[in-house]
């Protein structure tokens, strides 16, 4: 009997009727923090019971409408039985008298389907929607964005714009949460109250829009109504708190510029606490939202604010333990020793959350000394002096390694052991440099790649090559190879000048307004165009992004017509130094070829007869590969020969770089744009855009002017991939692939017999033909030879034969 009782109860639950109250969706808990008391997620769980009884309407993403069931009816289970069939059961003995339900035994012995049928016959009271179908129609039309019906109902006086059911949710609430901008405009124009509190959370329409990150709705409410961002809902959250909950960085930036500037009309205190004394920075740290954290810190958010659990934002950041988030908070001045109400500091919390290793890396990368109780490290060398030492160190390591290879003179052997020793000296010297010097002024991960060491390697190579040319080659070959030596001298002058010029010149920093009002005006322009997203606004530098620009982590600035970040010149390559960089690369490559040619001429002129019997161990095999001239240099001019071979190796990747850069220039592309071509064939990226579907841009404005993101792309590069990137081989391979596909692809589409060219199938708005692209790169202004030697003063350069300013280039038309 007990088993039967359980079965009957589980199979015939009481129907559950949805209420009419509704509110926006709560933010999701992002981390299980059961062992931490009074977490931010606990505030959301306080309303969990209320959420279960919400309206069947569900909030949707900006691309999906939100609808609600306005007519409630009893819900039946899948075992529902028509009441007419109650009199005709499988067996007449099974007929049920309703009076027998009073008996427990009768209930237990009754068939499940029969109990369901009896339950379904109960009459439910009419809902508010059923009692007032006109208002229900109005609410449903606001949800669906049916402006015609809403206008008809309001103009006819059948409903008032602020009419609600008992939940006090207005039509404006529904229009806001469903991103119906046209409807919001109409309702506000007809007197809708933007501060009406409704739903279980007693939230305003602005709250609903902020919770879902709807920038365009928030902007209209803020600028065209008296919507109050300081109003609090039942959970004590204001508009800024809810914007942070949405994790839409564009909305957070908008509210910071609109409400947290010194001269904001609708002022919001950036560290305004909620009911648990948690600020917006607490919530952003809990969510590990690095973009929001950086934005809040930029506007002066206090990292020392304490909530009711004595948690500072740093403590909440350990819930996920992202290194970038922890690092940003420590660099902003967070107290790593501050203790919460459980008497735990950041080290204890890191241990509890199993991220102690990450925490130690963060402290090291923020300049903390592990040998001194993590106190701030006191560098014994300044950053400027450290960079100079780093740059000059290869000037000593390279000749030392070359001399090791020359040990033994003309009787030398043991080629492989000497090569290993030379590489060990070079690698060991760089390792010590990294530990002793670079670590004193660069605390980030991958210190070597962020230091001027590679620029030093190149300049040291050029320095010793020039010395060899001056003291060995030039005196011997000056007469017989006069023109080659003159060309060599000219090329040395060109690549030396262009190298240092490309290193120290401003690559094209897009000016960043110092006045927040200017930035806000740029944001307003983007909103008007429907382009306020991460493709058109830089969330790192807070400036409107010109086309072809990108944020540089090296200089921490937005670079106009960004090409790439080059460790060999220790600078970014942009609109102002790209021509200089190409001049450097071309002249360097030609200089290497001329140096190799003159070296062979030198060996040929000074070589003497040598007896093969005097060859050292392994030299017979080496000479059989090198030939007479090279073998003479190998046996008699060891340092020169080693420099020759080192330059030959450098020539490989420099040639790759020349090929890739030339190809890209002829196609009207930068390195960054070329790398992004294959991504255009993939699905669209999320760029935090919340443009309403009914948004109407200004006259003549196109919404398709997009560009690759500024890079918040993330790669997990291994050491091999990093090496490929440094040498430019990855770009060469990509160029080779696309070139071969263009030449030999016979892909056919359907019944069309035309060949498919991957280079022409993608839309490249900067490609105006090979000749025009080449002229645009080298010439500024009119197509005259003298203009080839002009460098951009600001961001000017040619595009399709016309001068454009890449600092303010927002459209190709």
Swiss-Prot record:
Q: How does it sit in the membrane?
A: Multi-pass membrane protein
- The active site of this protein is located at 566 (s-palmitoyl cysteine intermediate)
SUPFAM superfamilies to which the protein is assigned, alphabetical: Ankyrin repeat
Query: What keywords sit in the KW lines?
Result: Acyltransferase, ANK repeat, Endosome, Golgi apparatus, Lipoprotein, Membrane, Palmitate, Repeat, Transferase, Transmembrane, Transmembrane helix
Cleaved signal peptide residues: none
From the record, what ranges are coiled-coil? none
Pfam families (UniProt xref): Ank_2, DHHC
Identify a single GO molecular function assigned to this protein.
Answer: protein-cysteine S-palmitoyltransferase activity
Catalysed reactions, semicolon-separated: L-cysteinyl-[protein] + hexadecanoyl-CoA = S-hexadecanoyl-L-cysteinyl-[protein] + CoA
Where is this chain compositionally biased, Polar residues type?
28-46
Q: Where is this region: Disordered?
A: 1-83
Q: Where in the cell is it found?
A: Early endosome membrane; Golgi apparatus membrane
Question: Which InterPro entries does the entry link to?
Answer: Ankyrin_rpt (IPR002110), Ankyrin_rpt-contain_sf (IPR036770), Palmitoyltrfase_DHHC (IPR001594)
Which SMART domains does the UniProt entry name for this protein?
ANK
Which parts pass through the membrane? 388-408, 413-433, 453-473, 486-506, 580-600, 643-663
Biased composition (Low complexity) is annotated at 9-24, 47-78
Q: Which GO terms describe its cellular component?
A: early endosome membrane; Golgi membrane
- ANK repeat positions in this chain? 133-162, 167-196, 201-231, 235-264, 276-305, 309-338
Identify the residues that the record assigns to the DHHC domain, covering every copy: 536-586
Under Enzyme Commission nomenclature, its number is: 2.3.1.225
To which protein family does this belong? Answer: Belongs to the DHHC palmitoyltransferase family. AKR/ZDHHC17 subfamily.
Function, as annotated, reads: Palmitoyltransferase specific for casein kinase 1.
Free-text note on domains in this protein's UniProt record: The DHHC domain is required for palmitoyltransferase activity.
Name the chain's protein.
Palmitoyltransferase AKR1
């Amino acid at each position: 009997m007990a088993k039967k009782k359980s079965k009957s109860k589980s199979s015939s639950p009481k129907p559950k009727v949805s209420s009419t109250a509704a509110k926006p969706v709560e933010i999701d808990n992002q981390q299980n923090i059961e062992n931490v008391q009074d977490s931010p997620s606990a505030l959301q769980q306080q309303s969990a019971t209320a959420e279960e009884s919400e309206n069947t309407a569900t909030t949707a993403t900006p691309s999906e409408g939100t609808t609600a069931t306005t007519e409630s009816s009893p819900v039946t289970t899948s075992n529902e039985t028509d009441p007419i069939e109650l009199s005709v059961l499988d067996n007449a003995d099974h007929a049920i008298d309703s009076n027998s339900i009073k008996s427990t035994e009768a209930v237990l012995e009754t068939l499940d389907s029969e109990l369901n049928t009896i339950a379904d016959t109960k009459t439910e009271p009419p809902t508010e929607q059923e009692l007032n179908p006109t208002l229900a129609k109005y609410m449903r039309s606001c949800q669906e964005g049916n402006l015609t019906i809403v206008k008809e109902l309001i103009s006819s006086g059948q409903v008032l714009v602020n009419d609600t059911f008992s939940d006090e949710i207005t039509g404006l609430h529904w229009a806001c949460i469903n991103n119906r901008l046209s409807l919001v405009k109409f309702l506000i124009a007809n007197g809708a109250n933007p501060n009406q509190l409704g739903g279980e959370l007693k939230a305003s329409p602005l709250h609903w829009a902020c919770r879902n990150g709807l920038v365009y709705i928030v902007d209209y409410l803020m600028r065209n109504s008296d919507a109050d961002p300081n109003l609090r809902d039942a959970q004590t959250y204001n508009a800024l708190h809810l914007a942070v909950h949405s994790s839409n960085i564009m909305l957070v930036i908008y509210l910071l510029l609109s409400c947290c500037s010194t001269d904001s009309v609708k002022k919001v205190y950036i560290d305004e606490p909620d009911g648990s004394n948690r600020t917006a920075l607490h919530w952003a740290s809990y969510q590990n939202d690095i973009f929001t954290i950086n934005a809040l810190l930029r506007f002066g958010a206090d990292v020392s604010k304490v909530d009711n659990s004595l948690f500072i934002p740093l403590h909440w950041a350990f819930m996920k333990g992202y290194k970038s988030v922890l690092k940003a908070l420590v660099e902003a001045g967070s107290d790593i020793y501050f203790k919460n109400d459980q008497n735990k500091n950041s080290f204890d919390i890191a241990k509890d959350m199993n991220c102690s290793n990450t925490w130690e890396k963060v402290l090291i990368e923020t300049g903390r000394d592990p040998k001194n109780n993590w106190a701030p490290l006191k560098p014994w060398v300044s950053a400027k002096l450290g960079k100079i030492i780093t740059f000059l160190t290869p000037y000593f390591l390279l000749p030392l390694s070359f001399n090791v290879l020359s040990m033994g003179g003309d009787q030398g052997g043991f080629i492989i052991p000497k090569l290993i020793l030379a590489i060990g000296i070079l690698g060991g010297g760089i390792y010590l440099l990294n530990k002793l010097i670079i670590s004193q002024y660069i605390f980030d991960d991958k210190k070597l790649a962020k230091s001027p060491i590679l620029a030093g390697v190149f300049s040291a190579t050029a320095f010793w090559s020039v010395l060899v040319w001056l003291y060995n080659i030039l005196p011997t070959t000056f007469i017989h190879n006069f023109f080659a030596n003159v060309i060599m001298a000219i090329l040395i002058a060109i690549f030396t000048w262009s190298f240092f010029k490309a290193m120290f010149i401003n690559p094209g920093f897009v000016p960043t307004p110092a006045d927040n009002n200017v930035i806000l005006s740029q944001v307003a322009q983007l909103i008007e165009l429907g382009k306020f997203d991460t493709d058109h606004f830089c969330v790192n530098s807070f400036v409107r992004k010109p086309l072809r620009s990108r944020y540089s982590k090296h200089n921490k600035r937005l670079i106009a017509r960004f090409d790439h970040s080059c460790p060999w010149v220790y600078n970014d390559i942009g609109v102002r130094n790209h021509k200089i960089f190409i001049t450097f690369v071309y002249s360097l490559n030609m200089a290497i070829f001329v140096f190799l040619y003159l070296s062979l001429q030198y060996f040929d002129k000074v070589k003497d007869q040598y007896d093969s019997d005097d060859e050292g161990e392994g030299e017979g095999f080496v000479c059989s590969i090198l030939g007479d001239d090279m073998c003479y240099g190998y046996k008699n001019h060891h340092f020169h020969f080693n420099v020759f071979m080192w330059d030959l190796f450098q020539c490989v990747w420099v040639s790759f770089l020349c090929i890739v850069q030339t190809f890209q220039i002829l196609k009207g592309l930068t390195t960054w744009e070329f790398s992004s071509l294959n991504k255009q064939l993939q699905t669209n990226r999320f760029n935090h855009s919340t443009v309403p579907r009914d948004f109407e841009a200004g006259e003549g404005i196109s919404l398709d002017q997009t560009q690759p993101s500024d890079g918040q792309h993330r790669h997990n590069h291994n050491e091999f991939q990093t090496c490929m990137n440094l040498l430019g081989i990855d770009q060469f391979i990509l160029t080779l692939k696309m070139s071969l596909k263009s030449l030999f692809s016979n892909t056919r589409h359907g019944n069309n017999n035309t060949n498919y060219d991957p280079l022409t199938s993608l839309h490249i708005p900067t490609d105006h033909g090979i000749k025009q692209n080449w002229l645009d790169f080298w010439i500024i202004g009119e197509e005259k030879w003298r203009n080839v030697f002009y460098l951009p003063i600001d961001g000017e350069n040619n595009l399709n034969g016309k001068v454009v300013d890449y600092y303010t280039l927002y459209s190709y038309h």
